[in-house]
Swiss-Prot record:
Protein name: NADH-ubiquinone oxidoreductase chain 1
One annotated GO molecular function: NADH dehydrogenase (ubiquinone) activity
Membrane topology field: Multi-pass membrane protein
Catalytic activity as recorded in UniProt: a ubiquinone + NADH + 5 H(+)(in) = a ubiquinol + NAD(+) + 4 H(+)(out)
Gene that encodes the chain: mt:ND1
Transmembrane segments: 5-25, 78-98, 105-125, 152-172, 176-196, 227-247, 251-271, 294-314
Species of provenance: Anopheles gambiae
Entry similarity comment: Belongs to the complex I subunit 1 family.
Keywords from the UniProt entry: Electron transport, Membrane, Mitochondrion, Mitochondrion inner membrane, NAD, Respiratory chain, Translocase, Transmembrane, Transmembrane helix, Transport, Ubiquinone
Coiled-coil residues: none
HAMAP family attached to this UniProt entry: NDH1_NuoH
Length: 314
């Protein structure tokens, strides 16, 4: 009984903490963008604007839920819910030492969840029955699939080195030296791929205001929009955490881990405040002509390195 209840309580606490983290990430983003644009940002609600995200949530969920006449009702309503469910499910592969869930195949679980995330975007765009939403959805799907290839290859090259699919072994492996020191180009590729994967500036083509209004979520209002928004920011937070686990290997219980996590999240926001939007064809060229060859080369290098070390031992 106790063994059955503890993982449930642990996962519930995790979901609550992620939601609170996402709320304050939006506040951090608005504050940082405010200071980048030489203004204050939110500072009225609560002490220095601390309660702003909660008032935003109340405002969004109390608004009227519109229903486009031509939309496919069930898929239109369930795609944001499924999107949020997937982005919260990915958090289960965090390398916890406590008795939550033991994931020996955490890397594969992460790749499966991110691949499934494509369908929610596609269905959200298609079920709205709006041309703009469909175009935004198609762009987002093409972009996500393109950058998932380089993400998977980078992870595969590290798996060859670490020899395990568990994220916990990444932390044990980097006791003496971080991966970022001898794989710096790979770290930059991973960061750029994360930006593309989460549809962030400079790769936010699903939301090109000048052409597609707001992208695949253009027909969503109040609750549906809030769920898509939560899913996006939850995946940003998770990608930042994954960058820290893979490249800046630190103990998940140390204060330094959360300091690094905050810094990587800040980089996501900083990039949004400073870089203009990329061109769509250049985005695709970047994925297939630059990132793919680089990650493949690193993969071959790591395989060769592993074979070399094994041949030295035996």
């Amino acid at each position: 009984m106790f063994d059955g209840i503890m993982p449930l309580i642990g996962s519930l606490l995790l979901v609550i903490c992620v939601m609170v983290g996402v709320a304050f990430l939006t506040l951090l983003e608005r504050k940082v963008l405010g200071y980048i644009q030489i203004r204050k940002g939110p500072n009225k609600v609560g002490f220095n604007g601390l309660l702003q995200p909660f008032s935003d949530a109340v405002k969004l969920f109390t608004k009227e839920q519109t229903y486009p006449l031509l939309s496919n009702y069930i898929s239109y309503y369930f795609s944001p819910v499924f999107s949020l469910f997937l982005s919260l499910l990915i958090w289960m592969c965090i390398p916890y030492l406590i008795k939550l869930y033991s994931f020996n195949l955490g890397v594969l679980f992460f790749l499966c969840c991110t691949s499934l995330g494509v369908y929610t975007v596609m269905i959200a765009g298609w079920s709205s029955n709006s041309n703009y939403a469909l175009l935004g959805g198609l762009r987002a799907v093409a972009q996500t699939i393109s950058y998932e290839v380089s993400l998977a290859l980078i992870l595969l090259s590290f798996i060859f080195l670490v020899g395990n699919y568990n994220f916990l072994s990444f932390y044990f492996y980097q006791d003496y030296v971080w991966f970022i020191f001898f794989c710096f180009p790979l770290g930059l590729v991973w960061l750029a791929s994360c930006l593309a994967e989460t549809n962030r500036t400079p790769f936010d083509f699903a939301e090109g205001e000048s052409e597609l209004v707001s992208g695949f979520n253009v027909e969503y209002s109040s609750g549906g929009f809030a769920l898509i928004f939560l899913a996006e920011y939850s995946s940003i937070l998770f990608m930042s955490m994954l960058f820290v686990v893979i490249f800046l290997g630190s103990d998940i219980y140390s204060f330094m881990f959360f300091l690094k996590l905050s810094f990587i999240s800040f980089i996501f926001i900083w990039v949004r405040g400073t870089l203009p939007r990329f061109r769509y064809d250049k985005l695709m060229y970047l994925a297939w002509k630059s990132f793919l060859p680089l990650s493949l080369n690193y993969l071959f290098f790591f395989v060769g390195l592993k074979i070399f070390f094994i041949s030295l031992l035996f």
